[in-house]
């Protein structure tokens, strides 16, 4: 039986755990850091079958996972911990020879684990080099994962795709370049990667609820023309952009010619059912097969019910391709759709 260490957004681990229980017959699920990390087993499902199934249809709230190949008591002693990490790394053998290896070290708050992520990484990297591997930060063939709780140390090695994310704990980090107007921009950047949907493949986007322009700025940077709809002002840096048209009206008040856009994005904080009504009414302004990236606000802490209701409502006009709680989501999830 294989055990996996898993991560969800803070406060959403109970929902990720429930997804796992529903998906995996016979699984055993146990919490680690309250509300954020937990373990589960493959239960009655063969490991390769399970991984293939989870990759094909990712759970909404499970952000990251890795197989636990060794579990040991955590120690606050640097020498003891370093010895344990090096001993595990020595077991990797042929797996890492001539391979690019990312080493990701995380710890729960208040864990006695004595190293920061860089120090822990260095202990393992030394052995990886001795085995003929190349430690890297990105584009790895293998990922060595280390996660320390208050009592236990979990370590394992797996491919990036089997982790569901190649970022530590499934938490991508983007540089806040000068062109990034708001933190909301990171949400769209993460969606682009999570959905494997290069934004520069589109030509004209409709951004509903665009102010102050976080998502609009990303789309403009990718070379798109953008029609931004919001009664509020956009960031001054965007006002004179030649590919931006800003319509200062509510999204419910606008209309366009059919097929005007090949991408719709919407990050409005309104009631999600009201947002759905607006987006569905605007479906005809999208070309056939156009994509939409839409934030779904989770109301009243009933995420499964909210997602079920909203995907049904959007399903009248759109094919639902993926729903995922991104690292940059809070009380919400992000959905990728295609116009029918």
Locations of regions flagged by a protein language model:
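SAM-dependent transferase fold signal centered on methyltransferase-like domains
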Residues: 1-340
């Amino acid at each position: 039986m294989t055990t996996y260490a898993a991560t969800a957004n803070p406060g959403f681990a109970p929902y990720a755990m429930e997804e796992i229980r529903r998906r995996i017959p016979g699984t055993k699920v146990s919490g680690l850091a309250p509300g954020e990390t937990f373990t589960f087993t493959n239960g009655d499902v063969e490991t390769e079958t399970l991984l293939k199934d989870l990759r094909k249809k990712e759970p909404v709230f499970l952000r990251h996972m890795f197989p636990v190949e060794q579990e040991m008591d955590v120690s606050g002693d640097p020498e003891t911990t370093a010895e344990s990490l090096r001993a595990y790394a020595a077991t990797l053998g042929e797996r890492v020879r001539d391979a690019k290896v990312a080493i990701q070290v995380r710890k729960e708050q208040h864990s006695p684990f004595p190293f920061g992520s860089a120090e822990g990484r260095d202990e393992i990297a030394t052995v990886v080099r001795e085995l003929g591997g190349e430690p890297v930060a990105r584009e790895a063939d293998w990922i060595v994962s280390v996660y320390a709780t208050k009592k236990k140390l979990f370590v394992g090695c797996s491919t990036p795709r089997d982790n569901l994310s190649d970022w530590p704990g499934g938490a991508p980090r983007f540089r806040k370049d000068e062109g990034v107007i708001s933190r909301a921009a990171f949400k769209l950047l993460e969606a682009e990667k999570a959905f494997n949907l290069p934004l520069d493949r589109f030509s004209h986007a409709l951004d509903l609820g665009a102010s102050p322009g976080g998502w609009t700025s990303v789309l403009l940077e990718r070379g798109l023309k953008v029609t931004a709809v919001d009664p509020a002002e956009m960031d001054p840096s965007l006002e004179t952009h030649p590919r931006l048209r800003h319509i200062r009206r509510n999204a419910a008040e606008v209309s366009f010619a059919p097929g005007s856009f090949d991408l719709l994005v919407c990050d409005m904080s309104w009631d999600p059912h009201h947002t759905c009504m607006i987006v569905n009414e605007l479906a005809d302004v999208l070309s056939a097969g156009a994509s939409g990236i839409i934030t779904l606000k989770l109301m009243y802490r009933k995420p499964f019910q909210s997602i079920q209701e909203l995907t049904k409502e959007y399903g009248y006009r759109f094919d639902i391709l993926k729903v995922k709680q991104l690292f940059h989501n809070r009380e919400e999830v992000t959905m990728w759709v295609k116009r029918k």
